[in-house]
Amino acid sequence: YLMGVGTPNDILGAVKRGVDMFDCVLPTRSGRTGLAFTWQGRVNIKNNKYQNDNTPLDLECENLNLNKYSKNYLNHLFNTNEILGSMILTLNNINFYQELMSEIRSNIEKGTFNDFHDKYINKL
């Protein structure tokens, strides 16, 4: 059990060292402040570079309900202080962490965790 450690990189490193349970507020706290976790890495949705970006937040997200929101729409929600932006990013982050943990379990079962770790340790 590892408490208070919550970045995807920290989780990957801890799993590699044998930790199998985590508890951290990072996914929800980050969502409320405009930071999204995605399979392509972290996205600070408040950044002006997303004002005209009509692509989904995470192209690899399996949850189609979350993937329908564009970066420019989420950027608008955060920059106008709409609570919906925080809610969507919080749900996105929780979903991402569920997908991450599912992929970790699957790769452990298949014996491919080290490859998975190496692919994502510097990306997430």
Regions found by a protein language model. Name each.
Residues D58-L124:
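C-terminal extensions of enzymes
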